Amino acid sequence: MDFWLWPLYFLPVSGALRILPEVKVEGELGGSVTIKCPLPEMHVRIYLCREMAGSGTCGTVVSTTNFIKAEYKGRVTLKQYPRKNLFLVEVTQLTESDSGVYACGAGMNTDRGKTQKVTLNVHSEYEPSWEEQPMPETPKWFHLPYLFQMPAYASSSKFVTRVTTPAQRGKVPPVHHSSPTTQITHRPRVSRASSVAGDKPRTFLPSTTASKISALEGLLKPQTPSYNHHTRLHRQRALDYGSQSGREGQGFHILIPTILGLFLLALLGLVVKRAVERRKALSRRARRLAVRMRALESSQRPRGSPRPRSQNNIYSACPRRARGADAAGTGEAPVPGPGAPLPPAPLQVSESPWLHAPSLKTSCEYVSLYHQPAAMMEDSDSDDYINVPA
């Protein structure tokens, strides 16, 4: 067998394994229900089928080909609403055997064209399952402190469900049955408008007015008793659930901002810590760089030590004068002949300062002391000599 034929064998299986959207519908015994189904864009056969428990196949209940199953003749109608993209199937005079699994679909093949799964549950009006169900209690660890608790909501016991049977719909005044122990009161059916204003005193209308109102209600097609009953129960459960979820939601509304605030504080602390560490690292690098620059400058200086200078010598800071000038001054003196007498001893002047002399100012002015030779110091009378003792 060719391999390309194998996917054809899995087509029915894939259609059976497709997950369909499921809708649950509940109805009262003897009442009616309306099932909403999606309407395809193409003009094809649409139907409502019921799944058989034994074989698993889906048998057609009603379709657009004017087919109605024998069990539902006179009790089921199918209407199309193209503008809303849906079609409605209304089933009246419900019985307990009508409970089961239904499916909406489109196409000629009933088993493969399913678009929606519908579960119908038919029950009596006084079934115990319709009593108020207690809400599950929240765990003790989830209870909020006293400061964060919300005020208690109204108790759900204030809502009283009134159920009537089809046999009691024609009776207007209430009938009281007395007994030695208990008292049971059967109340007539109350419409939605009268249930809202239930605290007001009741007024009974004349028979002519009642007949006119009944005729008007017949023209306007009032809602079925099952629908009204479902509406009241659904509203009651929604209020109970809303009060419970409101208390739980209040705790989450307080807990979430607290966690976010702590998370933001932790992030801010990390950012500040990183900034401080970076600043410290930059300061350490700057210090190390300064130390390296100082060491580099000291290593580049010449290592030859300067000539030590005496602190007491005032001329140590002045540069030395070249000796060429002194040589030039001494070279002008005439040299005495061999027969000439020796010149007298030159005048010796002590260069040491006097004791009473004030301290000399340090300056770079040069003081030149020239010793004039004896030949230059002679007068016209060469025989006169002046001897200065040393």
From Swiss-Prot:
The modification Phosphothreonine is found at residue 92. Residues 33-115 are annotated as: CDR4. Pfam families: V-set (PF07686). The chain crosses the membrane at residues 252-272. Changing residue 181 to A: Impairs O-glycosylation and trafficking to the plasma membrane. Residues 335-346 have a biased composition (Pro residues). Residues 166-204, 293-348 are annotated as: Disordered. SMART domains: IG. InterPro entries: CD300_family_receptors (IPR050671), Ig-like_dom_sf (IPR036179), Ig-like_fold (IPR013783), Ig_sub (IPR003599), Ig_V-set (IPR013106). The Ig-like V-set domain comprises three loops analogous to the complementarity-determining regions (CDR) of Ig variable domains, which are responsible for engaging IgM. Mediates multivalent interactions with the CH4 domains of pentameric IgM, facilitating receptor clustering and signaling. This is Immunoglobulin mu Fc receptor. It comes from Homo sapiens (Human). The gene is FCMR.
